Amino acid sequence: MAGVSVIPVQSKRDMKTFVDFPWELYRDDPFWIPPVKSQVIQLLTPGRHPFWTFSRRELFLAMRGSEVVGRIAAIVDGHYNEYQQEEMGVWGFFECLHDPEAAGALFAKAIDWVRQQGMEFIRGPLNPSMNYESGLLVHGFESRPTFLMTYNPPYYPELVKLSGFRKEKDLLTYLSNRDTKPPEWAMNLGERLAQKQEVKVRRMNPKHFDDEVRLLTRLYVECWGDNWGFSPPTASEVRDMVNSIYPIMDLDLAFFLYVQDEPMGVCVVLPDVTPLLKRFNGKLGLGALIKKHLYWNEINGCRGFILGVKEEYRQVGAPLVALHYLLEAAKNKPQYYYVELGWNLEDNQAINLLYEESGLRPHKRYRIYRRDLA
């Protein structure tokens, strides 16, 4: 058997190989969801995605002879490091055959690259940051992921541990469906709190796109600013994100919450379009998928993509009010049988307990790993 070599991605052909590799790796896996290829290329390309205005990266391929056996991205997120006053390197976009030698060579190359950039530790998988798809699936392999959540083979956690990484944080998702019966006390309390605080709900207005993006950016920082691993996305990143998902957004499930005309929370629930991504195998962008009306009956669920409440409203029941509105809005859409919420940090006990007491059940668990470089 030929040995493993790791090479940097330098040409368009190399980039195509890097992007295409998961299609080979997962070709017999019924739960893998192909991403939209054009969006993957955009996300990975400096000059085409706003993330790279403040960050840098190197892409690598692992070869065994002439066969591609794995890939990885080594990243320095300059915005995060400035915001958190840390020297963090990142690994992401990792895919590999069940080949410990190849995985070890990829991680060694990523570690060496971020060390040369002056980083003190490396964290991952982040694709390319916590504001995007993050975490390695460690529990919940028996079903497909929802839209914009990661997926990987069950052997990945062992490959990561063999390269000297330790668990740093777990991310949790929760599931509700039409058979879920939230306790009556929770629903009644949510209604009473909404009335007492005079909570108002306003749907996002696409006619005022720039204003809505600015408000979403502001609330994202105010709602999540104290979270572990957080760095605020730039307005350009938020605008790019909204532009990318807008074709499939259900505007009945995208709203801001107000108390006395002060915005206090935001919720965006997206149709789980993974059946269509699977059907069209990454060849169609989201704008093209929306035109495939014949197949939209295959979409029977949704994902709580964004659900946040400002800190000063959390102790007066606002998270329960937001959850109440979300679940009721989804329930009023007969095409949606289930809604997945998350991810949540494992130690966000208040929100995780709220979900469980409201009848939601734990669904999937994702893990962020760390290795110190000193």
PLM feature spans:
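Generic start-of-chain signal for non-secretory N-termini
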Residues: 1-31, 37, 374
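Acyltransferase donor/substrate-recognition loop-hinge adjacent to the catalytic core
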Residues: 2-4, 150-229
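Flexible loop/turn segments at secondary-structure boundaries
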Residues: 15, 78-81, 130-132, 181, ...
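A conserved beta-strand-loop-helix scaffold within acyl/acetyltransferase catalytic domains
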Residues: 22-65, 72-82, 208-308
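Alpha-helical subdomain
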Residues: 76-79, 278, 307, 353-359, ...
